[in-house]
């Protein structure tokens, strides 16, 4: 029996969304991708560099899919363009906050792929905040869009354990693959008409606000474990930062340092150089700093930093 494919619009921009689009195309689903919506080309590595397509646009062009670049999702013209396509379903993965005039155009609904186990970590930076908080489990959620951000009825969840040394970049890569599986499963349920949703429990809500210059600065007045979680939660971008000698100092990678000799931690943020390794103190112990970047310099490992720059034990980070 011939089944008319569902007309699908995919909306996404960064690397995180790429596996989902690829999975939709590769899966044996009764869907037709009638439009891919993404952000406009922009310089993405350095200021004043040549504009580059988004990762999603690059893949869409490779796959021969039509692409629409949108600057302002609230522009009435965008909503009209979506309506003209007569979508059955809209899939959103790491895109923008859509107005009802856009997501309401989908006959069977619009759903979002979110990189947390909702209602935990609602917001713009769920992966980062889960790691910063020391969570041992993360995952993805698909849910139907409604007016309040990240509050819609849940379609399905997929969970995964978090390794204690895993950073935000690594976890994002894993969750993008798990998320692609979730998107395909969700579409299959929608196509079959077998979706069963559940409301989010508001008593379990936690927030994952946007990362800023202010909330990515290292506060050394916390435990060594919390410092390590903060650093890996922001690696490799936007990166945890502090100051040293009045200059910005980024820390990309750290490790717990239980084997550091029983030296008094001193004031939180104290630097210790021992055995060719670089350490910094928290309130109850040490972390080892493994890779870093001084203001105006390229990223380097701690060994290179110690060989090339004057550094002494007892100096305070954050100064």
Curated annotation (Swiss-Prot):
Superkingdom of the organism of origin: Bacteria
Purpose: Attaches a formyl group to the free amino group of methionyl-tRNA(fMet). The formyl group appears to play a dual role in the initiator identity of N-formylmethionyl-tRNA by promoting its recognition by IF2 and preventing the misappropriation of this tRNA by the elongation apparatus.
SUPFAM superfamilies: FMT C-terminal domain-like, Formyltransferase
InterPro entries found in the cross-reference section: Fmt (IPR005794), Formyl_trans_C (IPR005793), Formyl_transf_N (IPR002376), Formyl_transf_N_sf (IPR036477), Formyl_transferase-like_C_sf (IPR011034), Met-tRNA-FMT_C (IPR044135), Met-tRNA-FMT_N (IPR041711)
Binding of (6S)-5,6,7,8-tetrahydrofolate, residues: 116-119
HAMAP family in UniProt: Formyl_trans
UniProt xrefs under NCBIfam families: fmt
A cellular component term, taken from the record's GO annotations: cytosol
Enzyme class, first EC level, given as a word: transferase
GO molecular function: methionyl-tRNA formyltransferase activity
UniProt keyword terms in alphabetical order: Protein biosynthesis, Transferase
Reaction equation(s) it catalyzes: L-methionyl-tRNA(fMet) + (6R)-10-formyltetrahydrofolate = N-formyl-L-methionyl-tRNA(fMet) + (6S)-5,6,7,8-tetrahydrofolate + H(+)
EC number of the protein: 2.1.2.9
Protein name (database record): Methionyl-tRNA formyltransferase
Protein family according to the UniProt entry: Belongs to the Fmt family.
């Amino acid at each position: 029996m011939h089944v008319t494919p569902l007309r699908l619009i995919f909306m996404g921009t960064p690397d995180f969304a790429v596996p989902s689009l690829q999975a939709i195309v590769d899966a044996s689903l009764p869907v037709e991708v009638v439009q891919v919506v993404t952000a406009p080309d922009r310089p993405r590595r350095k200021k004043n560099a040549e504009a580059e397509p988004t990762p999603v646009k690059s893949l869409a062009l490779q796959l021969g899919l039509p692409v629409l670049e949108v600057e302002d999702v609230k522009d009435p013209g965008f909503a009209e363009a979506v309506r003209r396509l007569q979508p059955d379903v809209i899939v959103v993965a790491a895109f923008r906050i859509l107005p009802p005039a856009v997501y309401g155009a989908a006959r069977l609904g619009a759903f979002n792929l979110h990189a947390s186990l909702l209602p935990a970590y609602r917001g713009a930076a769920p992966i980062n905040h889960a790691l910063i908080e020391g969570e041992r489990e993360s995952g993805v959620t698909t849910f139907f869009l409604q007016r309040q951000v990240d509050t819609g009825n849940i379609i399905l969840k997929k969970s995964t354990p978090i390794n204690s040394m895993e950073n935000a970049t690594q976890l994002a890569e894993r969750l993008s693959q798990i998320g692609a599986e979730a998107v395909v499963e969700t579409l299959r349920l929608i196509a079959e008409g077998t979706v069963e949703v559940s409301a989010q429990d508001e008593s379990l809500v936690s927030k994952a606000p946007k990362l800023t210059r202010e909330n990515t600065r290292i506060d050394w007045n916390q435990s060594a474990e919390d410092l390590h979680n903060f650093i890996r939660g922001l690696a490799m971008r936007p990166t945890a930062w502090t100051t040293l000698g009045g200059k910005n100092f980024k820390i990309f990678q750290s490790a717990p340092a239980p084997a550091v000799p029983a030296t008094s931690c001193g004031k939180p943020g104290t630097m210790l150089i021992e055995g060719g390794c670089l350490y910094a103190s928290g309130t109850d112990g040490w972390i080892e700093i493994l890779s870093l970047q001084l203001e105006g310099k390229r990223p380097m490992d701690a060994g290179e930093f110690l060989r090339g720059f004057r550094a002494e034990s007892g100096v305070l980070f954050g100064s």
